[in-house]
Amino acid sequence: MKLTSLQVADYMTPNPLTVAPEEPLLRAVEIIRLRGVRRLPVTVGGMLVGLVTDGDLKRAEPSMLTDSEEDFNRVMEATPISRIMIQNPTTTTADTLLVDAAEVLLNTKYGALPVVAGGRVVGIISVNDFMRALVEILREAEGNRGS
């Protein structure tokens, strides 16, 4: 494995689940909880307009002092994703070198980069994806050292 040839496409999650800005926060919460993802690209007609994270949603949730689950759901159903999403998030492309994307990710606060082609979301690469790459690289290096 040649480190300088590894690209985002080699480790990204292709065709991630997305949400629309007008959808309610409750929809994003449901997707994140049911699918076990931590970030959702926000799109209009396939074009990236934002990113919503599990942390954004937790900060936006009504207080635990909300009288009932019904009140909680009502607030989350009435609030659009656009109200809390990260607008114009930093992105990368599938053919970007993995090391370059990692450097970009270090300068963001949301733990993932949407992968775009012509403004359309084609994937997402997260800290976990970079960790998977690191494990593979280290295992290969360890194997080469033992040869």
Predicted regions and their residues:
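Short, charge-rich amphipathic segments
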Residues: 33-41, 60-63, 67
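The conserved cystathionine-beta-synthase
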Residues: 19-36, 43-44, 91-109, 116
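Tandem CBS (Bateman) regulatory domains
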Residues: 1-15, 53-90, 97, 102-106, ...
